[in-house]
Structures are given as C-alpha cells and as structure tokens.
A protein has these predicted regions:
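Surface-exposed ligand-recognition segments of extracellular binding domains, strongest
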Residues: 79, 83-121
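Intrinsically disordered, low-complexity regulatory regions enriched in Ser/Pro/Gly/Thr
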Residues: 25, 29-33, 53-55, 77-80, ...
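Extracellular disulfide-stabilized recognition modules
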Residues: 4-58
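Conserved hydrophobic ligand-interaction patch in extracellular adhesion modules
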Residues: 47-88
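Conserved beta-strand elements of beta-rich interaction domains across eukaryotes
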Residues: 38, 44, 67-68, 91-93, ...
Length: 121
C-alpha cells in the first residue's frame, strides 16, 4: 500500500481493534493493566487445559508480577465467582514457589497458609 492508503489502513485496523476490545470489556472477557491484556473465556478448566488455551490464544497463563496485575486477575475471580490458575509452581525447596519457567518468584500476595493447592489461594 502507498503512503496515505497505508495510513488509512492502519487507522482502520486500530479502530476495529479498539471496537473489539470494547465489546470484550463489556462482556467482562478482558481487562488491562500496565500494557498487558488479561483475558478469560469464563469457563472452568484444569491447569493444563488453561495453559494450553492461553498458548492457543498467543499468550501465556497469568502470572502477577505486581499488585496491579494481581488486581487484574482478581477482577475475573470476583466477577465469575471462581478461582484462577496462575503461572506459578512449587519449587524444589518445600514451601517456596517459582514461575513455570523456573525463574524466581518476585511477587506474591497469598492469604495466610496458602497456597494450599485447593483453588482457594
């Protein structure tokens, strides 16, 4: 596409994406924090299925790295009255946790005696 046509095409795409994001927000399917989009389909699934669905959508399972991201995830938990799987697993050191890729966990906001692995963390 040439100059002006290219700019018009980009503006049309931006407008369309903005409209789609608006619809998803209205349906409580996405929320945003810090430039990241957090999304859900609102369905219950097991951990492995959740990880796979996130990959299929071109993303990854949510891993809160600060209070704002934690709140974005909590938004879905409260709205759908459910729990959320996180991109965190138990480390080889009992009682310690790490990211799925093995990196050190730099943010946690657990309730007392959690996580317990019962979906109530």
């Amino acid at each position: 596409l040439a100059g002006d046509e290219n700019g018009d095409f980009i503006r049309q795409l931006e407008h369309r994406i903005s409209r789609l994001e608006g619809v998803l927000r209205l349906n409580k399917m996405i929320t945003e924090f810090g430039g990241k989009i957090f999304a859900t389909n609102g369905k219950k699934a097991d951990f492995d299925a959740t990880v796979e669905k996130c990959k299929e959508a071109g993303g990854s399972i949510a891993t809160p790295r600060n209070p704002g991201e934690n709140d974005a995830i909590l938004y879905f938990v409260k709205y759908f009255n459910t729990y959320a799987y996180l991109g965190i697993k138990q480390s080889p050191i009992p009682g310690k946790f790490q990211l799925l890729d093995g990196a050190q966990l730099s943010y946690a906001n657990w309730y007392s005696n959690e996580p317990s692995g019962k979906g109530e963390e």
